[in-house]
């Protein structure tokens, strides 16, 4: 069993890696983002019927999201952050403006509205060493749709 000091040190290290990954995403430094993500990662994203398997598929999904919201930004530092062992949770806000087409999983295309969202955004993540292997993201998709003029 890990001691409190070991657990606290591990949590602090993982929070640093998470911040590094989100700051790299905000800077569109995808080489650094890819170094943080495990090749066999799984991502659970609100609104998707199935999880995303693999870092390449996750990267492709994020690129599609950025085509819809080119100014997408995840705020750091995280106002809420905690963890235990290989798991951490961070809660912050994410913002973006709907200025590019959105392609739904069924192929339907939604034209941009030019409206912005500002949502509480959280992620619970599991780490394998220094690589993120599970992401469970959470945010209010109904509120996002309302803010974007889609509901």
Show the residue positions of the predicted features.
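C-terminal and inter-domain tail/linker signature
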Residues: 2-151
């Amino acid at each position: 069993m890990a001691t409190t000091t070991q657990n606290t040190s591990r949590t602090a290290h993982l929070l640093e890696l998470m911040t590094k990954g989100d700051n790299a995403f905000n800077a569109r430094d995808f080489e650094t983002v890819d170094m943080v993500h495990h090749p066999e990662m799984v991502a659970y994203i609100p609104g998707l019927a199935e999880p995303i398997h693999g870092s390449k598929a996750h990267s492709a999904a994020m690129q599609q999201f950025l085509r819809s919201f080119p100014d997408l930004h995840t705020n750091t530092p995280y106002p809420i952050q905690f963890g235990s062992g290989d798991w951490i949770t961070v809660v912050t806000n994410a913002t973006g403006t709907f200025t590019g087409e959105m392609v739904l999983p069924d192929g339907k295309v939604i034209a941009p509205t030019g409206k912005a969202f500002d949502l509480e955004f959280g992620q619970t993540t599991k780490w394998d060493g220094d690589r993120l292997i599970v992401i469970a993201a959470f945010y209010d998709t109904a509120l996002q749709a309302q803010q974007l003029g889609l509901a």
